[in-house]
Amino acid sequence: MTENLQDMFESSYRGEAPEQLAARPPWSIGQPQPEILKLIEQGKVHGDVLDAGCGEAATALYLAERGHTAVGLDAAPTAIQLAKGYAAERGLTNVTFDVADISNFTGYDGRFGTIIDSTLFHSMPVELREGYQQSIVRAAAPGANYIVLVFDKAAFPPDIDGPHPVSEPELREIVSKYWTVDDISPARLYANGDGFQDGGAQRFAEFREESNGWVSMAGWLLQAHRD
């Protein structure tokens, strides 16, 4: 992960990002993303779980509370500090967290039965994707599942400065080099509505204001596995 990108996420988790209107980053919604939650409830998670680019680790914490052994990795030390604090508050001993470059990490070879990427994929520079895929494949156990929730490129204006969303063919091409892709389907990604500046969200296609104060945008939900 580049130093500038790490600094950007650090300022977000500290509540210091100039474009951030709320104390927490808009993507920190206090629970797993609903699309990920559906797959968890459908029994798509097995074995030890890697929450890749975990942030404040809502997914890893949720799974640990339900008996899974989970690991959360993120490049932002403040996010990891927050995640460790939440785990301690809940008395969870089956989840661990560490600061790591998700595009080049070691120490977990062949461990994880499920790897979950909840909005990480579009958060890293394009040039880091290959290293990221190689790192998580190295960490995957035989038969591992890989789940990705990522922004759809069609929902973003072409001059956007920030995330790196993907088209369905682009996502399939990248992931299929390393995994057997089982499904890619349209999805929604949710965020706290108070984290957006007035009028700024109207530049995005398929932007929705939800009844619970969240907002949502179009994305892709990928499911894949290792043979």
UniProtKB/Swiss-Prot annotation:
Biological processes annotated in GO: methylation
Molecular-function annotations in GO: methyltransferase activity
EC code: 2.1.1.374
Enzyme class: transferase
Stretches assigned to coiled coil: none
Statement: the UniProt record of this protein carries the keyword Transport: no
Family statement: Belongs to the methyltransferase superfamily.
Main location: cytoplasm
Matching Pfam families: Methyltransf_31
Subunit organization: Monomer.
UniProt name for this protein: 2-heptyl-1-hydroxyquinolin-4(1H)-one methyltransferase
Keywords: Cytoplasm, Methyltransferase, S-adenosyl-L-methionine, Transferase
Organism: Mycobacteroides abscessus (strain ATCC 19977 / DSM 44196 / CCUG 20993 / CIP 104536 / JCM 13569 / NCTC 13031 / TMC 1543 / L948)
Catalytic activity: 2-heptyl-1-hydroxy-4(1H)-quinolinone + S-adenosyl-L-methionine = 2-heptyl-1-methoxy-4(1H)-quinolinone + S-adenosyl-L-homocysteine + H(+); 3-bromo-2-heptyl-1-hydroxy-4(1H)-quinolinone + S-adenosyl-L-methionine = 3-bromo-2-heptyl-1-methoxy-4(1H)-quinolinone + S-adenosyl-L-homocysteine + H(+)
Subcellular location: Cytoplasm
